[in-house]
């Protein structure tokens, strides 16, 4: 999910 990329 896009939020996973933001977490990184």
From Swiss-Prot:
Tissue specificity is:
Expressed by the venom gland.
Q: Which residues form the signal peptide?
A: none
Gene Ontology CC: one annotated term: extracellular region
According to its UniProt entry, the protein's GO biological process terms are: killing of cells of another organism
The UniProt keywords, alphabetically, are: Cytolysis, Secreted
**Looking at the record's lineage, which domain of life comes first?**
Eukaryota
> Which locations, inside or outside the cell, does it occupy?
Secreted
Name the job this protein performs: Causes weak hemolysis, mild mast cell degranulation, and small LDH release. Therefore, this peptide may be considered a weak cytolytic agent acting on mast cells, through two different mechanisms of interaction with the cells. The interaction with mast cells occurs through two different mechanisms: firstly, the peptide may bind to a G-protein coupled receptor (GPCR) related to the control of mast cell exocytosis, and secondly, it may cause a minor structural disorganization of the mast cell membrane. Does not have antimicrobial activity.
Name this polypeptide is given:
Cryptide TyPep-9
Which lineage? Eukaryota, Metazoa, Ecdysozoa, Arthropoda, Chelicerata
């Amino acid at each position: 999910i896009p939020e996973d990329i933001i977490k990184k």
